């Protein structure tokens, strides 16, 4: 069994962050303080830390899209990915990269989508029809 990962990231507004991660991404809240919030994101611990400002780095070209160099997310099952995609569309989330299939017909073919949280952190959620393709060359 794979162990959960831990990721901490900066946010500029804890109230908006909590609303987004709970209501949009359906994360559960763990411990919190006036400076941070733990979230359960698909079984992984992600922690939003309050900062004064958030500087977002550049992007890189990947399969024709400008992908934020700094981003995080979860590799979902294809059914979870489709369910999340439909939920995000219903919530009228503005995508950085619309839901699509990347590397079509190539090694590593995947469903992917990118969007930002209220503090401008880029998130990517992806899925593979065959999990053996996750690290394919």
Language model regions located:
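A short local loop/turn or secondary-structure capping micro-motif enriched for an aromatic residue
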Residues: 47-48, 54-58, 131-134
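Core segments of cupin and vicinal oxygen chelate
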Residues: 10-53
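Short secondary-structure boundary/capping segments
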Residues: 29, 37-38, 61-64, 104-105
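Non-catalytic surface loops within mature trypsin-like serine protease
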Residues: 13, 43, 52, 76-78, ...
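N-terminal beta-strand motif that seeds the catalytic metal site of vicinal oxygen chelate
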Residues: 1-15, 72, 127-137
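Short N-terminal helix-initiation segments at or just after the protein's N-terminus
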Residues: 7-22, 56-65, 92, 121-122
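Vicinal oxygen chelate
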Residues: 4-11, 40, 60-137
